[in-house]
Amino acid sequence: MRTTRRNFCSNTALALLSPRLLRAQTKAQKQAQTQAQNQAQGRALPGTASAHADVAAIDHDRILTAAQRYLTQPPAPLTAFPAPNSPGTPNDFYSEANEEKPPTTTGPSLSAPPATSEPAPFTAHSDALLNFSIQVPTLVAAYILTKEARYAEHAAAHLRAWFVAPATSMTPALPFAQLIPGTTKPRLEGILETVQLVEVAQAISFLPRSEALTPEELAAVYVWFATYLEWLGTDRTALLARDQKNHHGTSWLLQAAAFARLAPEDSGGERKVPAPAPSQALAPPPNQYINLNALRHQYKSVTLRAQITADGDFMHELTTPWPYRYSLFNLDMLAGICDLLSTRFESIWDYELQDDPSMRVAIAHHFPYIAHRGTWPHPADITHFTELPLRQPSLLLSGRAYSRPEYVDLWKTLPPDTTDPVVQRTFPIRQPLLWIRRAPAM
């Protein structure tokens, strides 16, 4: 048969399209299998029921009860807690490594203290940052619900103490976080400390219209986050954290995404609420190191491949003594990243690699283990295993993104809070109201 130009073009097109058609058919078959499983287990099919919970109603009493309690607690910045071993200034964040250790039954009786014991690591700054990160989002959530100025004003008082007042504001860098006592070498593990500030950044975007902060104070807060964002993008230790293939790398990306959203638009950021006109001259300069477009590229090209297996596991979390807690921690942070980096024109939630690693696969894989902890197929965590799961925000955010009401229904049934600081530190998204609502424009 004589080869014509038409035959050649047709055969070439068929050869090029065949792999794509095969992948599309495979994906359709997987979707059909998933739907059949859902029907067999009595679950709602995607899109057949509402996956949008009324978070304001669900959390109303919880938020206001906590906010009322926090109104009586004054700001407690780092300078209120002197760190005797810190090589830095009173404004520098300082913490000492406090690695959780497996319980042991060897040696002296566990009921009696050892004859000599090492001093407890210094955690006062970590505790202060944790409390700050719990109180400010709660107060702002209460302001959203009630429009009562007292909540916004008390949140603003905390922000002034931590980010504005020179005498008490925290230095926007972490060279002394999670140090080994007696050393001064920075450690990448320290970057995890400020993942608590992610929800504080979310809360800040709801405050400008409250006028609880003056334009100059608001600009100073923006400058603080812009300066810290630059440090995250240039410091060697911070970049080592960025390149980790586990929750440390995810924490860096979540922080960068949250803080970049407070950056000026001409830096590639998407500040949710622009600084009021009188303070434009005080606004931070464009960040030349980190912007949201670069972070989207990192998520697509690095994070998915490095962290998620084809079946949805986080392989690098499974080798730790806390595979369950760290997997849920990582899942929640990835959900926050997808939420922060998505736009009206591009949903990061829907991005997936050709061999399937994706957020959609990860949440579907972990869903049954959140619903029934006892089915977890890997070793149980050596500590705090029975205190989980909590009301994981990944369920709510993924349920909304993928129209999966069963995720949201499970989220509603789980405990929303914990008082254990160890678990709190791996649960940085505590006020979902700040994530499902968009800050009002100026």
Language-model region placement:
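Secretory targeting signals
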Residues: 1-3
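Extracellular glycan-targeting catalytic surfaces
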Residues: 9-21, 25-27, 39-242, 250, ...
